Amino acid sequence: MNIFFLFFSFLPAAVSLFLQVAAGAVWQIFIKEGLVKNTQGSVLFYHMIGLCVFGYWYFAVQGTGLKETAKKIKETGKNCSILTVIGIFVLGMLLCVLGNSMVGVEKYLFPSLVEQYQRMMENAGMGTSALTVFASVAVAPIGEELLCRGVTLHYTKKITPSFHIANFFQALIFGLVHFNIIQGLYAFVIGLFLGCVREKYNSLLPAMFLHFAVNASSLFLLGGLLNRIPDTPVSWAVCFVLSLAASVILLIIDKRPLFERTKIK
């Protein structure tokens, strides 16, 4: 195991933590000076900064420019069928159910931690503020994929020749960058799938779309359905097992990559 790249694998997460703290502090200064009134705008502020920082970092480690990136986007669009797009979106919905099922089970195992998590989400205005909705659905999928499946996975792949071990490390770091246990646990599991999608299609774009589908499903599509699930440990455990099994099956159905790895790295 390459200890040098193991250190670099955690460096993006440390930078993310610094940016979150710095963005929150700067936003408080904006509020104090009367420049802004909405305290929830700090979430979008952080994600916009992170998008710039990790976007530049990703292009730096990949050695690609805007021209090559545009070429890759065009190639992805050409080779991505409508069934692939639908499949990724359905996978996102399944992962949304999986994540909520994990929280449902954890509510009975770690009630105080789940209560703290729910209070934190409410204070952040998740699902209620237009700024946080835009940040979590439109901006976060891009920035967090650049951070974890872009920069971090680039370094974890240098630790070991095994993709599965490298994917485990990047998913672990993806869980850690959420900086709370409850969200970190389901982020870890979802991060495993995001890493597999990025590797399968040899592109960050499908992973970004999957991330968008997960977040959009959580906020807009599945709220009513999830509220109808009986609030018992057994019900949530069954939902977890079924959604996990369906997600794995859906992930492995289409074995065709979007394009040959020898053409575009």
Enumerate the language-model features and the residues they cover.
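Membrane-interface helix/loop boundary segments of multi-pass membrane proteins
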Residues: 143-169, 196-203
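Membrane-interface starts of transmembrane alpha-helices
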Residues: 33-53, 127-132, 136, 158-170, ...
